């Protein structure tokens, strides 16, 4: 959940200058191919139990709008589907406002549930037996036994913990309520260090040279600008910091398959090579009247997937572009689509 009812003011939408292709209606009974599928995480609205996961087949453009319900006798996910991860033949669907993680098998049928969480955000396996879960309110990171799907401990970390990545047996975690990225020893579950990365750091990726890129959205009320920070994961030295103009709030940092090109949202989709020395001035894909809310890069063909929340009430539009910024296809998903998982 991105707290859109706090962070955004709904404005009057103007018609886009370029008319998009017609949007096909999703079908629940469709033919799927053997190609790699795309899962779309749909938050739904707050407390409305309309969270869902949509399935898209890029080879024939087939859509199953509510795939989890389709595979589980119309069972509801809960309130605010936040993220989706895949590990050891299991899918882990993090349901933020319902305080749980739903576990599914390869057929997306529910096989278990992880409970006892405050307000979970993201799931990260750190070994074959253990995973970490970040949390909005708990002031800690949850430790999960993957054999039993039970919380077995926690790591104290004040603030709103968010995205996590792992490298060199270290877990790097962003914190929306602190100015720092925290480093955790994944063997003994202790915080060992921290690095300044700016206000409201949320998304991060690891490039081809094992550098960590952290995107902080900034805080306008304290005149703290957004920034993109490049950190050496081995020695934790700050290699480069890019500072955005005051008033900008970039988010949703992504990386392509070769890990040499960054993408992010900033009222449009922007692209940055990991060797660039300054931020791009022009968007690769302009938002126009659209409300870009989620972003993903398909590692199988480099296509750019964008979720348009429209008005946070209607079902989201999903737009697919190639790397030249040309629109290839669009379709409907669930309410407030916020991200993508790509099969590989």
What are these regions (language model features)?
Residues 1-2, 18:
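N-terminal hydrophobic targeting signals that begin at the initiator methionine
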Residues 14-16:
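C-terminal motif of bacterial Sec signal peptides marking the signal peptidase cleavage site
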Residues 18-344:
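Predominantly soluble domains enriched in secretory-pathway, periplasmic, or organellar proteins
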Residues 2-8:
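Sec-dependent signal peptide recognition
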């Amino acid at each position: 959940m991105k707290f859109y009812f706090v962070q955004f003011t709904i404005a009057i939408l103007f018609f886009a200058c370029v008319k998009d292709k017609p949007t096909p209606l999703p079908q629940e009974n469709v033919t799927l191919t053997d190609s790699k599928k795309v899962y779309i995480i749909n938050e739904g609205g707050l407390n409305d139990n309309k969270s869902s996961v949509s399935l898209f087949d890029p080879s024939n453009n087939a859509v199953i709008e509510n795939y989890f319900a389709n595979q589980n006798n119309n069972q509801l996910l809960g309130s605010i589907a936040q993220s989706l991860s895949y590990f050891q033949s299991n899918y882990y669907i993090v349901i933020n406002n319902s305080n749980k993680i739903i576990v599914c098998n390869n057929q997306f049928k529910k096989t278990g549930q992880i409970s006892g969480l405050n307000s979970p955000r993201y799931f990260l396996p750190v070994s074959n037996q253990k995973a970490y879960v970040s949390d909005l309110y708990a002031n800690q990171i949850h430790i999960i036994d993957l054999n039993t799907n039970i919380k077995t401990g926690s790591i104290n970390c004040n603030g709103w913990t968010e995205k996590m990545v792992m490298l060199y047996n270290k877990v790097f975690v962003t914190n929306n309520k602190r100015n720092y990225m925290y480093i955790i020893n994944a063997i003994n579950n202790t915080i060992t260090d921290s690095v300044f990365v700016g206000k409201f750091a949320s998304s991060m990726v690891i490039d081809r040279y094992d550098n960590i890129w952290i995107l902080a959205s900034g805080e306008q009320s304290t005149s703290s600008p957004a920034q993109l920070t490049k950190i050496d994961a081995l020695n934790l030295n700050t290699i480069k910091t890019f500072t955005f103009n005051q008033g900008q709030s970039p988010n949703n940092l992504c990386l392509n398959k070769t890990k040499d090109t960054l993408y992010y949202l900033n009222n449009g989709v922007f692209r940055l090579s990991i060797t660039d020395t300054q931020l791009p001035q022009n968007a690769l894909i302009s938002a126009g009247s659209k409300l870009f809310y989620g972003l993903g890069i398909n590692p199988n063909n480099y296509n750019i997937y964008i979720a348009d929340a429209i008005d946070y009430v209607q079902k989201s539009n999903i737009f697919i572009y190639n790397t030249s910024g040309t629109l290839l296809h669009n379709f409907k998903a669930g309410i407030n689509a916020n991200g993508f998982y790509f099969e590989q």
